[in-house]
Amino acid sequence: MLRLNELQLAKELIRFPSVTPVDAGVMSFLEKKLKKLGFKTKILEFKEKNTKPVKNLYARLGNKRPNFCYAGHLDVVPAGNLKDWTVNPFKPSIKNGHLIGRAVSYTHLTLPTIRSV
């Protein structure tokens, strides 16, 4: 089984401007990563009348019990006017030992965090 580099994954996830309902490819990206780690995955698409479809990724590793279920999201709120930012929100950087980028404090980055614990 491959190992996951948590910081690298976090940086890669930040690069996706995944503003709902457009996932900007983040679901497919994460699905490929999880498959390489041995997960069985499935992307489901949900759509209600007069709305754009929204994707969800389900991933499972093994069949043993008890189960651990993680429910999170990979979307972000719109960044607004990029001219108002002091950095590009979708270009991760490290400043003074802190990861800087869009969704750093969101559920968006809990997967790398959970994996590292």
Question: Residue ranges of each PLM-predicted region?
Answer:
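Acidic/His- and Gly-rich active-site-bordering loop/insert found
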Residues: 2-104
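Conserved small/polar residues in nucleotide/adenosyl-binding loops
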Residues: 107-113
